[in-house]
Amino acid sequence: MDDSTITYAGPAAKAPSDRVTETYEVPVVMPGMWDCHGHFLGVTRLDLAEVMRTPIAVSAARIVGDAYAALMAGFTSIREPGGLGVYLARVINEGLAVGPHVYGAGAILSQTAGHADIHEYPLKWIHDLAEQEGFIHVCDGIDGCLVATRTQLRLGAAFIKVCASGGVLSQLDDPIHQQFRDDELEAIVGEAERFDRVVAAHCHGKPGIIAALNAGCRTIEHGTYLDEEAADAMIAKNAVLVPTRYIVDRLVGFGRERGVPDYAMRKIEAMADQHKAALQIAIEKGVTIALGTDIATSGEDTVAPWGTHGSELRHLVDAGLEPLAAIQTATANGPLSLGRQAPQAGRLAEGFVADVIAVAEDPVGNIDVLAEPKNVTHVWKSGMLYKQPA
């Protein structure tokens, strides 16, 4: 590694000896991992209304710790589809906080009465939140969608996030229903493309998946009701699935006891088996997959705590991926989710970003080793060592 770039990767015996200044003996070395769906919200309970109730200064303080936890778990890059990530990235890049590379989308774009419209609050409050550059932006009509998209670009968004279907944590909508009209989705994608940004589409229902693909969205987040026809459409469009099986499992297992609203629990419990079946279809059909968790809460004793990202790999293997292919979703496939904003990263190869981790055991033989941050013994981000044994 030379500064932030890998200058050689291969057998140690063939390494250019005049360039070696330090050596480390580790069992396994691999690229730093990507979580392509995590929200820096700074809340301790997975409830959209909780974000409204939490002072922004408290949220901001919490996510600094969340970023550190992600890096210590071996995740050197986070793609954040809605939250405070655009601001956190600035602080990390200034060297004032320790964390991964953060590629934020700014606010989530939602139609009125959509997934990211917090239905239990007055609509004026939701619009006020957008005006204060909060984590959601409700917009309607082509003009409104253009303004919302440009607002995120003004904040420095690396991509755009849109809700193309209903969701779980939103109180009154149906996850199966399409959200935004086709022309609204096309306007958002077209405006993002003018700025070399891709669009990530939150989609549970098939109508939203197909509409998002037809509009040109690069990634489908969740894909709960994906079937063979939708999988074929994803392949034809060269789109990427970010399945987030982790959050489904965590909500079903721990949601009620960790304060997730009853309406959300009813939705996720009804969808859980379908979500796994959709992931299996995607794997069988050969859809490109990038790892994402939908991690969003601060603190270890919460429903989806930062630092537990590696658990998603077990879910991918259980759904049918070979361990090496699962690892690829967290490494080489991660940058695919950012289009032309992606760095040359995710591989141990000359010229790639020097994001590297060492692991106590070969994850190809035991994928669960990556679920425990303690098994990640070393972390280099852009060539700088951030973690090593004491």
Protein language model regions, located:
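Histidine/acidic-residue-rich catalytic or RNA/ligand-binding cores of hydrolases
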Residues: 44-48, 116, 170-171, 209-215, ...
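C-terminal cap of metal-dependent C-N hydrolases
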Residues: 330, 348-390
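Metal-associated gating/positioning segment near the N- to mid-region
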Residues: 27-94, 112-119, 183, 215
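Histidine/acidic residue-rich metal-binding segments in metalloenzymes
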Residues: 144-241, 250, 255-260, 269-289
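Divalent metal-dependent hydrolysis catalytic cores, especially in the metallo-beta-lactamase
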Residues: 62-88, 99-108, 157-171, 198, ...
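Active-site mouth loops of central-metabolism enzymes
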Residues: 48-61, 126-147, 198-200
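His/Asp/Glu-enriched, well-ordered alpha-helical/loop segment
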Residues: 194, 263, 273-362
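Histidine-rich, glycine-flanked metal-binding segment
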Residues: 1-30, 49
